[in-house]
């Protein structure tokens, strides 16, 4: 697991939750 990927995935979840 890479921190960059984890941060990217977290960003997608936040954006998806926002929509």
Curated annotation (Swiss-Prot):
The keyword Calcium applies. One of its GO terms (cellular component) is host cell postsynaptic membrane. GO terms for molecular function: ion channel regulator activity; metal ion binding; toxin activity. It is found in: Secreted. Keywords: Amidation, Calcium, Gamma-carboxyglutamic acid, Hydroxylation, Ion channel impairing toxin, Ionotropic glutamate receptor inhibitor, Magnesium, Metal-binding, Neurotoxin, Postsynaptic neurotoxin, Secreted, Toxin. InterPro entries: Conantokin_CS. The modification 4-carboxyglutamate is found at residues 4, 10, 14. Expressed by the venom duct. A divalent metal cation binds at residues 10, 14. The modification 4-hydroxyproline is found at residue 3. The keyword GTP-binding does not apply. The modification Asparagine amide is found at residue 19. The mature peptide does not contain cysteine residue. Adopts an alpha-helical conformation in presence and in absence of divalent cations. Belongs to the conotoxin B superfamily. Conantokins inhibit N-methyl-D-aspartate (NMDA) receptors. This toxin has the highest potency for the NR2B/GRIN2B subunit. It induces sleep in 10-day-old mice when injected intracranially, and hyperactivity in 24-day-old mice. This is Conantokin-Pr3.
């Amino acid at each position: 697991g890479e921190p960059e990927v984890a941060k990217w995935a977290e960003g997608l979840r936040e954006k998806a939750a926002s929509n």
